[in-house]
Amino acid sequence: MAFYLEKDYFQDIELFNLLQQKAKGKELTLHWYEAKTERVRLAPRDPARGLTYEDCNVGSYGYDQLPELLRTNYSMAPRGAELWGTLPDLGYTVNRKSAVWADNVAALYEEAKARRWAPAVDLAWEALAQAPVPEVLEAALAQLCTFLQECAAGALGLAAHWLSRINQELLELKSYLCLQMLDQARHIEVLRKRALAGGQGLKRASVSAEQALKELCAAETYPAASVGGHLLLGSFLLGVYRQVAAVAPSPVDLQLCRLVVQDTARMVAYGSGQVRYHLAHQPQQAAFLQDYLDRAEHCLVGLMGSPECVEPLILLCGGGSAPEQVQGGSQRVARLQAGIVAEYLERCEGAGLRGRTERSRLPHYLKRSR
């Protein structure tokens, strides 16, 4: 929906005359000079890390002082600035701190900056040509890279969907979500380049995975989107990347997975912290999240059971396509899937969703499928 000002500044004679006077150095009001704001002088607590958001957590500028319900600022004004005049209402729909906050969000933001990497130069791409991966494994990698790009696009879209809806007072959280989007964009980049650099190109999109991702991205509230995107999807991706790192057919693939794992681990850490903070301040919402997961956990089945995911994983884990390799790979993938579910449920329990392990249909489903 478009927004139009009540006035056209091209037609504002008063503003034009004011600009003329200022250009001549006349009639400076300097009303901003004595703004009704808190004066502070900050210094890094750890010079090696520099001045961090945690160092800036002081007084009216800090996030600890934020109220639970954000009632006074719906504009773009930075937290701690003097609010005056008619600032626009941007229509934020997430105005409750405990709906989105996590105690570790400022630290995760700083970590994401400190550990940034560039796919173009931080991987030894030339090594792929010097020591090519066997064709069957290269094809499996290309398919898995295709699938994982779809997952990264889903995680990116989830963060992007909520970013403009969250009140600007929660600036550290919004800054972290921006870096999470950058992480996922970087994953799309590196996975695409890996598939194209190995001689195979991209393979086949996954219908079941994309349907599952769409459902997770369509969660009606941020807490539901977070538990579904950061814990459910994040646990799946973290498990897959760690497994591929364990069976990586080349040093390039090992380094790629190690770098992606550190980014994905941050996403999961934020998700755990967000759910924990949310339930600590709104314990009555545990029933809502439990009900949401009752309905959403089938999406993990759609991801894990996608032929475009499970089959290339079997070949990579087995080391090839010979019958005995497929058999061995299948067993390793079965253990991987069980591990993903167990770690996801453990994270839910640790975040405050007590009884999730007994309530979830995932363990029973996996047991029946073996």
Language-model segments: residues:
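Active-site-proximal alpha-helical scaffolds that flank and shape metal-associated catalytic sites
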Residues: 193, 197-265, 295
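Terminal targeting/low-complexity segments that flank the catalytic cores of oxidoreductases
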Residues: 1-160, 164-170, 201, 220, ...
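Hydrophobic alpha-helical core bundles mediating ligand binding, dimerization, or RNAP-core interactions
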Residues: 237-241, 275, 300, 340-341
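Alpha-helical scaffold segments that form or flank carboxylate-/histidine-based iron centers
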Residues: 139-148, 169-184, 226, 251-264, ...
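A beta-strand-loop signature enriched in Asp, Gly, Thr, and Trp
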Residues: 256-260, 267, 272-296
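Long, hydrophobic, well-ordered secondary-structure blocks that form the structural core
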Residues: 149, 155-217
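Charged/polar positions within long, soluble alpha-helices
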Residues: 157, 189, 193-196, 243, ...
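Alpha-helical transition-metal enzyme core signature, strongest for iron centers
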Residues: 148-156, 177-195, 227-238, 260-271, ...
